A protein has these predicted regions:
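Acidic/His/Gly-enriched intrinsically disordered linker/tail segments
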Residues: 93, 97-108, 116-124, 136-265
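Beta/coil-rich, acidic/histidine-enriched accessory regions frequently appended to metallopeptidases
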Residues: 27, 191-194, 225-316
């Protein structure tokens, strides 16, 4: 009996999660996803797992194929753990999520690590899952980076005024990156990378809006069948990359070139100062006019000679 008790105790010890203070990965599962997280992140993990199931269908719809189930998702609570679970290489320091189609794997930074809320992390999840979906739809063929990232941003629905500012600044300063340079990779510089992401989203959206959702689907299918991006674009839209890029840039100039002027801090400060000075000038002008009117009214009411102009002798 004593040996049985000792055996049970030893078994329980081996089942314990390690030294005090260690945080082993916990796991949650749903029909299409497995979420690994650390205990303080349980509520966030449950939320993201539910949202992943809900948005899966809409993302697959645009690409046509889904990754095999289950897709593994890591929710890393710190930058160090975010790095540790990467299967290859190290992500840029500004990265908040990574996707590895060959591993059917997504790695996310927890909101605790990036000081963001649920909605932002959900956007990152959608973005990274879109990478897996597109890779599956392409059947092992490589998409140009602008298509890969543009499709993912389109699915994440994370476009905001800050992205609009990045893109419009690129338009105004004539610093847009040629799309041919965004085919094989993105710049490592953070601002240039942001511009590359913004351009990719904008260009893929332009294709979808100008030529229809079916054109985007034809582009993806063309690459999946082995066509290069140039030929796939021609079959999807009737135009090659150069002509499409010119039409897209013309649209950008009409849409975004005014934005930095209207929204920059300096412009807003200058406009506020100008309005303040204009208000001050109008107020002074009104005050001077009022003062003149008072002086005119007083002049009409004054006697012809001021009191005390004559003494008593003069009156006699």
């Amino acid at each position: 009996m004593k040996r049985i008790v000792i055996f049970v105790l030893l078994s329980l010890i081996f089942l314990l999660p390690g030294p005090l203070g260690a945080s082993p990965w916990q796991e949650l599962s749903s029909p299409y996803f497995t979420m690994r997280y650390q205990e303080p992140e349980r509520k966030m993990a449950l939320f993201l797992l539910q949202r992943a199931e809900e948005v899966r269908g809409s993302i697959i719809q645009d690409a046509g194929r889904a990754p095999p189930a289950p897709t593994l998702i890591y929710l890393a609570p710190t930058w160090e753990q975010f790095q540790e679970v990467q299967p290859q290489g190290q992500p840029p320091t500004w990265a908040v999520g990574t996707a590895y189609p060959e591993h059917n794997l997504i790695i996310l930074k927890s909101p605790r690590a990036v000081k963001k809320g649920r909605s932002e992390v959900e956007e990152v999840l959608r973005h990274e899952y879109a990478h897996l979906v597109l890779a599956r739809a392409l059947k092992g063929h490589e998409a140009p980076q602008w298509l890969d990232e543009g499709f993912a941003m389109l699915q994440s629905r994370g476009w905001s005024i800050s992205w609009t500012y990045v893109l419009s600044r690129g338009v105004l300063s004539k610093a847009l990156i040629p799309l041919t340079e965004l085919s094989d990779g993105f710049p490592l510089d953070q601002y240039q990378a942001q511009l590359a992401y913004a351009q990719s989203f904008s260009f893929v959206s332009y294709i979808k809006n100008e030529y229809g959702a079916e054109a985007l689907a034809r582009l993806i299918k063309g690459i999946a069948y082995g066509l290069d991006a140039e030929e796939a674009l021609r079959q999807a839209t009737g135009l090659g990359l150069g002509n499409l890029e010119r039409g897209w840039k013309a649209e950008l100039k009409k849409r975004y070139s005014w934005f930095p002027i209207a929204t920059s801090f300096f412009s807003l400060w200058f406009l506020a100062s100008l309005l303040f000075l204009l208000g001050y000038w109008l107020k002074r002008r009104k005050a001077k006019r009022t003062l003149r009117e008072w002086e005119q009214e007083e002049a009409l009411q004054e006697p012809p000679f001021p009191p005390g102009s004559f003494d008593d002798e003069d009156r006699e």
